[in-house]
Amino acid sequence: MKIHVFLFVLFFFLVPIATRVKCAVKDTYSCFIMRGKCRHECHDFEKPIGFCTKLNANCYM
């Protein structure tokens, strides 16, 4: 019974956290590695990015 509870907690609580960390890593790559391609406002086909402190950018081309 304890194994079922453990798997339930693992699946429903820890998996979404891992997904958010994965997105944060992707945003960090977009902001810091592709530094010259970030801008403060989104234009036509640019993708919005998340938290970016160094550039304070919202989009990348």
From Swiss-Prot:
GO cellular component, one term: extracellular space
Subcellular location field: Secreted
Chief subcellular location: secreted
Originating organism: Homo sapiens (Human)
GO BP annotation list: cell chemotaxis; defense response to bacterium; innate immune response
Database matches in PANTHER family: BETA-DEFENSIN, BETA-DEFENSIN 133
This protein's name: Beta-defensin 133
S-S bridge residues: 31-59, 38-52
Gene Ontology molecular function, alphabetical: CCR6 chemokine receptor binding; chemoattractant activity
Family: Belongs to the beta-defensin family.
Lineage: Eukaryota, Metazoa, Chordata, Craniata, Vertebrata
Leader peptide range in chain numbering: 1-23
One Pfam family linked to the record: Defensin_beta_2
Record keywords: Antibiotic, Antimicrobial, Defensin, Disulfide bond, Secreted, Signal
Function: Has antibacterial activity.
